[in-house]
C-alpha cells in the first residue's frame, strides 16, 4: 500500500539477527517470521502486478562464522555472506556463487558488494558509472566504488 501510494523506498526491520549466543533458539523464532513475511510480500507484488517495478532486498552487512562459538552463536564473518534479491525485473530462481563445504570461503563466483549495488541501480534505471552525489565537501562521489558492473546473471 505504501508503494501504491507513491512511497519510493520502504525499509523494514525486525529482530536483531546478531546472534552471538543462543543462535538456534533465536532462529527457530525469527526465521519462520521472515519466511512468511517475504512470501506474503512477493505474492502480493505478483497479485498487484508490481513484481517488475519493485526490488526486494534482504541483506546484511556481513556473514556469520561457519563454526558455532562457546555461547552457541555465530560471530561476524566478512569472508562470506548471502543476499536475497527478488522482483525489480531481475532474473529469479537461481543461486549465484558457492562456498566451500563449511560455508567459510567463497569458491565459485564470488560477488562484491559493489556488483549488487550496481545491479540494483541498473534495475532502477540509474547508471552507476556516471551518476554521482555530492559529499559533505561538495565533491562528487560515484554510487559504486571501483566502477563494478551489474551482475549479468540477474539482468
PLM ranges: what are they?
Residues 1-155:
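Ligand-binding pockets and gating/stacking loops
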